[in-house]
């Protein structure tokens, strides 16, 4: 996959365009993010439609990209902003405007069609910032 194509996936993701999953994920894709695991395009769509996008604005930034043709490795910075007060989210209770910041490395394995068949997420940091501006390192959130 060319870097420009990968960055188009990120652009569409940032727009909450879940049809990007149809275009970029293999039908049997496997995702591992800490202790959270799910499979397939439907698993990815469910995760974002139910667990993330109703509760958070999520924006991805990719400052570094490398590829050997069958794997893509990136440095990922992700910023989550709580849309509203909520007692139940994937990260626990949140208040509107509170943020979570992920800094990590993600490895994508590509199938023969150039689609993501395996995605592995590794954490450097996951920081919660309260409505009062207090920052707390959460380690791996799930």
Annotate the PLM regions.
Residues 1-142:
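C-terminal and inter-domain tail/linker signature
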């Amino acid at each position: 996959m060319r870097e420009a194509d990968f960055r188009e996936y990120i652009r569409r993701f940032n727009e909450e365009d879940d049809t990007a999953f149809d275009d970029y994920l293999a039908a049997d894709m496997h995702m591992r993010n800490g202790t959270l695991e799910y499979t397939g395009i439907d698993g990815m769509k469910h995760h974002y439609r139910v667990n993330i996008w109703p509760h958070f604005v999520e924006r991805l930034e990719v400052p570094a990209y490398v590829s050997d043709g069958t794997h893509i490795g990136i440095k990922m910075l992700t910023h989550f902003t709580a849309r509203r007060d909520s007692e139940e989210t994937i990260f626990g209770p949140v208040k509107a405007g509170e943020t979570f910041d992920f800094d990590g490395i993600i490895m994508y394995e590509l199938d023969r069609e150039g689609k993501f068949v395996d995605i592995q997420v590794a954490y450097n940091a996951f920081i919660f910032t309260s409505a009062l501006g207090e920052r707390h390192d959460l380690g791996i959130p799930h």
